[in-house]
Amino acid sequence: MVDIKKGPPPDKIMNYLGSRMEVELKNHHKIVGILAFYHLQEQTIHLTDWMDVDEKGQITKSGSFIIINRTAWFQLYNM
């Protein structure tokens, strides 16, 4: 698992388009999905086929498309 926040700079996140990613939110929920788009200036992540996973790894929510604003996410990982 590559920690993109501490690894490649934000302008390299676009290299992961189409990859399965894990986003840890500031409330420590983890959302897993396919990176569809990343807005560099606003650091907004767009995921498709996403799942919200709790601490035990159980899926609590899921959907086809979600936009996560930078103020909500804490870490971004390539799975």
Give, region by region, the residue ranges found by the protein language model.
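Conserved RNA-binding domains used in RNP assembly and mRNA/RNA metabolism
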Residues: M1-M79
